[in-house]
Amino acid sequence: MFGHNSKVDLELNREVEKLIKTGGKEKIMPIVQAGEPVLRQQTIAYDGQLSRKTLDKLIDTMRTTMLEAPGVGLAATQIGLGLALAVVEDHVCEGDDGDPREAAEFPFHAIINPSYEPIGTETRSFYEGCLSFDGYQAVRKRWLDITARWQDEDGNKHEEHLHGWPARIFQHETDHLSGELYIDQAEIRSLTTNENLEDFWCEDPVPTEAAAELGFEL
């Protein structure tokens, strides 16, 4: 449980309250873009530094910001906050059956102090994007199956086997909290604008045609 051996950091709590207010009535906060130092910093583990009221407001505002963007994950660093906290949520669309990306329902979670480790050695390479590298996507190889670990808002510990697209989302957001952007290990020759992805490559979820035409390996 959070707070058992810790006290609220009053200064940090005030800073976070100010940050939340940048979202206005709509609760949509500005998203930090690549090049800002906070995205490259190792985050601080969360251990009750915020009041529960402030933590709940932060998580709610992060979720609204994520969904409005729209996105399926948002790390605290992406709103300029160096705490080990992210939100994730994704829902399967009609017609997704058979998609090689293996999308699956991923209900909303606030993931605090998350970590993961691969299960097995299988990887998959697909296009992915980032709200902090807006307007672009690139092919990134990631583990197909992971053991995901995190704490919830109450400090309860969770461990779950994630597979396919939910595993990719969890890896992406957890990496943010260690100062990593997906582009760091992406196939750089695959980099494309969202518009060009839609025009040229969206019919090929496994990017074999893009690999051949743009000159990268899967």
From Swiss-Prot:
Gene3D superfamilies membership: Peptide deformylase (3.90.45.10)
Active site feature: 173
Residues engaged in binding Fe cation: 130, 172, 176
Family annotation (InterPro entries): Peptide_deformylase, Peptide_deformylase_sf
Cofactor(s) it depends on: Fe(2+)
This protein's UniProt keywords: Hydrolase, Iron, Metal-binding, Protein biosynthesis
Catalyzed reactions: N-terminal N-formyl-L-methionyl-[peptide] + H2O = N-terminal L-methionyl-[peptide] + formate
Family: Belongs to the polypeptide deformylase family.
Function: Removes the formyl group from the N-terminal Met of newly synthesized proteins. Requires at least a dipeptide for an efficient rate of reaction. N-terminal L-methionine is a prerequisite for activity but the enzyme has broad specificity at other positions.
The protein's name: Peptide deformylase
Taxonomic source organism: Bifidobacterium adolescentis (strain ATCC 15703 / DSM 20083 / NCTC 11814 / E194a)
